[in-house]
């Protein structure tokens, strides 16, 4: 029997150390350690500390596991999306929507929210088609937020954008109202800014993959034609 290790293990357990902490000092099997320490009772304070530490370690391990899964999933989506570009490359709607989102869409990776804002009705109509036909977003997943100036009729503007986007008002977030400037007072055709929102991280990553795939495709063609990239 490893008497020296046993004495040290008992001493550490009485100090409230966990089995994992003790095994780093007394290098014996978990079964042997359990046998040595089975009659040692911890104080309520020691039990609470070990319980809190265990929860923290488990939470950290779970967070790292989820992070790894998220990274792997993102890599897979990006890879698949980049491959899809070849089949979409001659589709005018795909290219127009991708370019518009690239220029005007939300690209923040903090919340990975798909968002496109514009005051031009034609651009909003095109992007609604793009999200529906290319991205396959079902109607019930769309959310709309309007930004208008206080002088104008909120209800009329909400109805206008609801009709244009074909999204029911029940899927509109609260309209954001700003003070009216002199410039907007003179504009009878003013309808504010419409923000299309889609809470879908996979779609956000897919669009990013399309952009990367498009760039790769362009660079390849430029090299084939001896053009500087």
PLM feature spans:
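Short alpha-helical "recognition helix" segments of helix-turn-helix
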Residues: 21-26
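Short secondary-structure subsegments characteristic of cysteine-rich extracellular domains
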Residues: 109-134
């Amino acid at each position: 029997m490893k008497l020296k290790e046993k004495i040290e293990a008992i001493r550490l357990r009485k100090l409230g150390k966990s089995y994992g902490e003790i095994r780093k000092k007394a290098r014996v099997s978990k079964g042997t350690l359990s046998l040595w320490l089975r009659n040692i009772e911890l104080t309520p304070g020691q039990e609470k500390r070990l319980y809190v530490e265990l929860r923290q370690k488990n939470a950290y391990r779970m967070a790292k596991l989820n992070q790894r899964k998220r990274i792997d999933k993102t890599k897979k989506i990006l890879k698949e999306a980049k491959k899809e570009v070849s089949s979409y490359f001659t589709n005018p709607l795909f290219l127009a929507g991708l370019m518009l989102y690239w220029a005007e869409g939300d690209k923040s990776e903090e919340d990975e929210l798909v968002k496109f804002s514009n005051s031009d009705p034609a651009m909003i109509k095109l992007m609604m088609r793009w999200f529906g036909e290319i991205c396959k977003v079902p109607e019930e997943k769309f959310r709309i937020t309007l930004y208008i100036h206080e002088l104008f009729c909120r209800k009329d503007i909400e109805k206008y954008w609801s009709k244009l986007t074909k999204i029911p008002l029940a899927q509109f977030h609260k309209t954001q109202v700003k003070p009216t400037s002199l410039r907007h007072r003179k504009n009878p055709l003013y309808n504010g800014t419409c923000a299309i929102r889609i809470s879908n991280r996979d779609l956000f990553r897919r669009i990013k993959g399309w952009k990367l795939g498009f760039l790769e495709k362009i660079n390849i063609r430029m090299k084939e034609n001896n053009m500087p990239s």
